[in-house]
């Protein structure tokens, strides 16, 4: 049968490209590694600002990768629908700053706030970056049933310290010993999409 297409994007030497290749090899996918230059990144900024209708530095920076990877997919494959990891940080306590939550109640309320506000910024940005290249994005981490279930889990089970328990600890634990991801990727420290 036909292999699943997977995609990664980054500048040459990016550690995220290396880890994405490890996962692709492990899963046996048809992997596309998209290496971009600083010039490619800078050249895309004006188009990205137009597409997402925002000048916000953080938003634009986070959108360039989505735009460039979806542009590559549109120009080089017959893929029309793509899956991404949007929402996993918000739903699954993936932001490093959450380890400093002063209480379990604060961790829970911040996670709920992030999910509630997600559609104002990240999802809209991502959708516009991807759809501007004629693709549709699917976001499994934002499935309503998954979000409702995950938010109902006690904060005690989701808390992390950044050392013994990394961000998205419970999600990582769910994949542990399942043979679905290599341990070196499953248990690696987080790197922001726009930084990797």
Describe each region flagged by the PLM:
Residues 183-196:
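PAPS-dependent sulfotransferase catalytic core
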Residues 1-179, 194-196:
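ATP-dependent adenylate-handling active sites, centered on carboxylate activation for C-N bond formation
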């Amino acid at each position: 049968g036909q292999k699943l297409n997977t995609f990664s994007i980054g500048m040459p030497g990016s550690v995220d490209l290396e880890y994405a290749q490890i996962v692709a090899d492990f899963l046996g996918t048809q992997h596309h590694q998209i290496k971009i230059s600083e010039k490619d990144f800078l050249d895309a900024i004006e188009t990205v600002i137009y597409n997402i209708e925002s000048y916000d530095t953080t938003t634009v920076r986070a959108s360039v990768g989505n735009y460039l990877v979806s542009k590559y997919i549109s120009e080089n494959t017959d893929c029309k629908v793509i899956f991404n990891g949007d929402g996993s940080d918000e739903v699954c306590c993936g932001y490093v700053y959450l380890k400093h939550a002063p209480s379990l109640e604060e961790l829970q309320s911040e996670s709920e706030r992030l999910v509630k506000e997600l559609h104002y910024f990240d999802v809209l940005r991502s959708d516009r970056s991807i759809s501007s290249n004629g693709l549709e994005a699917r976001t499994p981490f934002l499935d309503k049933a998954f979000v409702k279930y995950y938010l109902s889990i006690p904060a005690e089970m989701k808390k992390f310290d950044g050392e013994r328990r990394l961000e998205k600890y419970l999600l990582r634990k769910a994949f542990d010993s399942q043979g679905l991801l290599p341990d070196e990727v499953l248990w690696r420290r987080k790197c922001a999409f726009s930084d990797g």
